[in-house]
Amino acid sequence: MVGSESGFHPGVLLPDEYWVFDFTKGPNSNWRCPFDYQIGRYDEYRPGMYTTDLFSGERDLHVGLDIGAPVHTNVYAFADGVVYSLGINPEAGSYGPTIITQHELRLPRSVDSMELNPVRKFWVLHGHLSTESLTMVKVGSVVKKGELIATIGDEKEN
């Protein structure tokens, strides 16, 4: 996760040790992760993982960054922004309770570059949250970098 050295706040405060999943070989239902905190990689080919009706077996590319953590772990705004939307996505395989934040940022043109791109809008989807998280913010609310905006939900909520 992006840390304070970049000017961003971590979305979840990770311990020193956590697991980074490799789902490129498909799911293994017999294996259990030995760590309480885990990362699921962005832009990863994941064969056989999206089997619910929501995806109709047609998806195999993961387009987000997953952070696994114990239930009720705090979730923070990574940058200043606004709550764009919130709600519950109840379909099997979907996000469950979800908050989307909108941010306007100037990011470097490349890694290690001091030259910045123009201001661009970004939307961050915070999914698999606790249902109570939907009462912690309101659509249109301003959020500040590092502000508590949600907590991780349990499996029955997601």
Segments from the language model and where they lie:
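Conserved beta-strand positions that form and line the central face of beta-propeller blades
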Residues: 66, 125, 151
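Zn2+-dependent peptidoglycan hydrolase active-site motif and core
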Residues: 77-136
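Short, solvent-exposed loop/turn segments at the edges of secondary structure
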Residues: 62, 94-96, 158
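Generic structural motif
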Residues: 67, 73-83, 143-146
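Polar/charged, compositionally biased leader and regulatory segments
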Residues: 1-72
